[in-house]
């Protein structure tokens, strides 16, 4: 599974998403221009010491990325979409695409891929969720559909006691 951030602006969000990718094995694709330097201390701090676990790819444009992976399915996450992210049957090689924090994905991109746009249901009064939170919500739904393959599902219990949920 792949996470795509189109022109991300806030280094802390990208760092948090990188940490999510490290913990899940998802690949991270960053589409330029980035709103920060990859040497940014907030980016590195948010990703903690997990950067060595993340496969990060940089692309000069979304068109170049899409062309390179044209045989894959792309889902475009937007507050403007009609379909819920829960209505999709994800494949493990799908691309989940998210826009920049201030504006989301460009309207022409959403129009061109209208059939593959998805949204997270939320209150009408709320404009949007934080980018890193939105990525986590959609990513874990996709992983859940595949029984969290290759991920550790069970912990060691709480203080040596068996716990049931």
Predicted regions span which residues?
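Post-transcriptional modification and biogenesis factors for structured RNAs
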Residues: 1-165
């Amino acid at each position: 599974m792949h996470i795509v951030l189109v022109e991300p602006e806030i280094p802390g969000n990208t760092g948090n998403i990188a940490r999510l990718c490290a913990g899940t094995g998802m690949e991270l694709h960053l589409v330029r221009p980035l709103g920060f330097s990859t040497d940014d201390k907030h980016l590195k701090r948010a990703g903690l010491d997990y950067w060595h676990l993340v496969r990060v790819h940089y692309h000069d444009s979304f068109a170049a990325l899409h062309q390179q992976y044209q045989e894959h399915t792309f889902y475009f996450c937007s507050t403007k979409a009609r379909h819920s992210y829960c209505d999709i049957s994800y494949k493990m090689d799908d691309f989940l695409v998210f826009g920049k924090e201030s504006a989301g994905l460009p309207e022409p991109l959403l129009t061109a891929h209208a059939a593959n746009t998805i949204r997270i249901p939320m209150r009408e009064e709320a404009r949007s969720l934080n980018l890193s939170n939105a990525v986590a919500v959609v990513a874990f739904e996709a992983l859940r559909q595949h029984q969290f393959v290759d991920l550790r599902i069970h912990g060691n219990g709480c203080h040596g006691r068996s716990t049931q949920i």
